[in-house]
Amino acid sequence: RQGKDANNGEFHESLNSLAAILGAGLVGIDKTNQDGYNYVKMVQNYFNSDNGWNIMMNNTNPAVANLGGGYGRDWWYDVLPNALYYAVCDVFPNVDGAERIQRSIAEQFVKADSVLNGNYDYSYFDYKNLKGYVNHIPMQQDAAGGHAYVLLCAYHKFGDPRYLEHCKSALEALISQKESRFYEALLPLGVYVAAYLNATEGTNYNVSKLFDWVFDGCQSSSGRTGWGIIVGKWGDYDVSGLQGSITDGGGYAFLMNSIKPAWPFIPLVKYQPEYAKAIGKWMLNNSSACRLFYPGDIDEKHQWAPELKNITNNNVSYEGLRKADDYGKESLKGVSPVAIGDGPKWIEGNPAESMFSIYSSSPVGILGAIITKTDVEGILQLDCNATDFYVDKPYPVYLYYNPYTTICLCTF
């Protein structure tokens, strides 16, 4: 946020607030009673009813939304806050007013899916007038995955069969695509829904196809071309598993996008364990590479602004990790990778400090809740229940992946 004085203190984004509250709750911090505040109650201010949309949105109102960030014009920005809010409400149940908001979100998503009727070929959707629009950004058909996830959570919470019906309808709209339409962060949620329904509802959705669409990325010239999972080494650093653009400047990974898929993918293996080895391998690589966004964990010569790293306390990361600098900084010529950010590009005169990103760092508690080190270097204990929301969890479930060619013994 820009502080209490700029724009009446109202310029802040729910993607930051919700992700931070979720991550904190997952690692045991009570955000309903911290420093004299109930942050979980406060975050309800992102519920937009005055504009008639009646869902959680990325900003509190349209006036500040025009200052930046997605709001009412970029579909994933309007769907993801609702998935995050449902997750927050499972971690922090029984907060006054939350159930009313959750019910409203579910009803709006049912109405939207009914109107869309299998056709998600839009850049964004007006949840007041129930109409889809195409603008200058690519169509985001993977918003259907976000709809499906929220409606599955709503079905678990409220038991309304309409929510399950439209969860399936949205998922079928996603699966009916002819190619990957991976846009930002919603497709992985759809993969989870497909696996869950296959295990619990007797469906036969093609989970492998959805995984391919995430990992191989969008290859359509009409979509967000190149958006997928990065594989390989940049210089001496292994960056396999990170998510972002496979093609932009040879590769451009983002921390937020690298963290978020762990939320649906790790619990998914409970429902389709044939993917356990692949997901375990991905998570080991991804979690290792995620450290490279933090200024205290990557060599200074690979950072755009190493002289500023102390302001982060190594809690706030760079927004991105590029294969090569795209600002033309002389000292970074031939250096790969480079910890970097887009902040200075958004508004002329933005300082280098804007490369450090709360937006990117806020969901890190998701990794904190899932990952525990074992007594064998390179073998992680991954908690498959940590981010499996609104389901019965009668016993602990952990995923261990052994990257070695020999048998290893871990202490449980």
Protein language model regions, located:
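Catalytic domains of carbohydrate-active enzymes that cleave complex glycans
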Residues: R1-F412
